[in-house]
Amino acid sequence: MIWHIQNENFILDSTRIFMKAFHLLLFDGSFIFPECILIFGLILLLMIDSTSDQKDIPWLYFISSTSLVMSITALLFRWREEPMISFSGNFQTNNFNEIFQFLILLCSTLCIPLSVEYIECTEMAITEFLLFVLTATLGGMFLCGANDLITIFVAPECFSLCSYLLSGYTKKDVRSNEATTKYLLMGGASSSILVHGFSWLYGSSGGEIELQEIVNGLINTQMYNSPGISIALIFITVGIGFKLSPAPSHQWTPDVYEGSPTPVVAFLSVTSKVAASASATRIFDIPFYFSSNEWHLLLEILAILSMILGNLIAITQTSMKRMLAYSSIGQIGYVIIGIIVGDSNGGYASMITYMLFYISMNLGTFACIVSFGLRTGTDNIRDYAGLYTKDPFLALSLALCLLSLGGLPPLAGFFGKLHLFWCGWQAGLYFLVSIGLLTSVVSIYYYLKIIKLLMTGRNQEITPHVRNYIRSPLRSNNSIELSMIVCVIASTIPGISMNPIIAIAQDTLF
């Protein structure tokens, strides 16, 4: 009898939960329409893979790319709409969140054509790769719009789980297995640290989980200046730091970059930073509103360590991917300057603008590395010597992307850094901006060192890898070079295009 009553209660509770979920999806589904497009694309991929043969492989790429482009289109049509909070306060839709979602979708859209030839040559499983990329993109998009602690924890876990699987996709590669193990262990540790920080916020605010309600709860409980908030700030900064990979939370980055498949590294190097930056701005700016001095100091320390260590250690690297790993650590230091400045002096606008340029510069560089690696099988910087004599197009493309990463005028990276540093200078971050300028000069040194190798024509310096280099005969049909051309053009945009980009970015306020 008791079992029967308990069974009936379980059925009633399950029905209520299902009806509530259906009600939320029915009335709030329009607020996540771009995400729904990706979910539909995921389902379609699974259906086609389970019912088709190898001849339908082009359809898998087409569906993935189309769903991403349609999701971007849906975001653009929703631009400038009034900010809305949906799903019982769990998700927020506004211009600020949507521009970060756009950046993530743009990264994924460029990464798929970059991966096609690599997947074919290495005989990787295609469907699973595309599923993981789309699911990680979905997790990143939900993280950008997350408005409560639970969603902020679950969304990056969705992204991280796919990242672990992608980094270990080449199971027979010992370096890939080692990288995945380190990535998984450190990712699990950082997630536990992050949720511990959330628990301090939850308790201090009187049991609130929504970001704005946490602020109100801290005021009501008079806990906004308590030691518990400082503890929460430290734990949350460490947890988010793993996603952003600033120093000293960067230990996993070089190994994962070196051991993972190159298209996976290209995808992770930008999407993880974009999603984590969007989440960091909201977490630091809203729940820690009363602790702005403390988190400014913490981020300044992280930025200084990242810019100095990242760029100095990059000089000593012999692997191209490890060099870019340490370079990315330095780049995130520049991005943190924009987070510290905030809205007051256009910090968020400068950060968004620089991240847009960083996407094109970084993906363009990785497209060149993928193309060179498939034809030579090497990743050593010395093996790039004399590439200009065999493939001038690839050498010039790589040189332009590296120069843009270094911030040389008149390339896009120069104007992105200039605007970012100027906003920091106006906000009074003189020491931080000075460190940024000095480390940018250091980065130009090791980028120019690689470019000098590319352009050398002396036979004694040209390695056998370049002597035996086979140039691609059909450029128009090469998807890697399609991504490369798009990224190189975007990386060399002159300063005349800065004003409209900054104007759009300045509209992305909370």
Swiss-Prot record:
Molecular function GO labels: NADH dehydrogenase (ubiquinone) activity; quinone binding
Example GO biological process: ATP synthesis coupled electron transport
EC number(s) recorded for this UniProt protein: 7.1.1.-
Keywords, in A-Z order: Chloroplast, Membrane, NAD, NADP, Plastid, Plastoquinone, Quinone, Thylakoid, Translocase, Transmembrane, Transmembrane helix, Transport
Reaction catalyzed: a plastoquinone + NADH + (n+1) H(+)(in) = a plastoquinol + NAD(+) + n H(+)(out); a plastoquinone + NADPH + (n+1) H(+)(in) = a plastoquinol + NADP(+) + n H(+)(out)
Ranges that cross the membrane: 24-44, 57-77, 99-119, 124-144, 149-169, 183-203, 227-247, 295-315, 323-343, 354-374, 395-415, 418-438, 484-504
Matching InterPro entries: NADH-Q_OxRdtase_suN/2, ND/Mrp_TM, Ndh2_N
Enzyme class: translocase
GO CC annotations, alphabetized: chloroplast thylakoid membrane
Membrane topology: Multi-pass membrane protein
Protein's cellular compartments: Plastid, Chloroplast thylakoid membrane
Quaternary structure, from the entry: NDH is composed of at least 16 different subunits, 5 of which are encoded in the nucleus.
Task performed by this protein: NDH shuttles electrons from NAD(P)H:plastoquinone, via FMN and iron-sulfur (Fe-S) centers, to quinones in the photosynthetic chain and possibly in a chloroplast respiratory chain. The immediate electron acceptor for the enzyme in this species is believed to be plastoquinone. Couples the redox reaction to proton translocation, and thus conserves the redox energy in a proton gradient.
Listed HAMAP family: NDH1_NuoN_1 (MF_00445)
Family: Belongs to the complex I subunit 2 family.
Designated name of the protein: NAD(P)H-quinone oxidoreductase subunit 2 A, chloroplastic
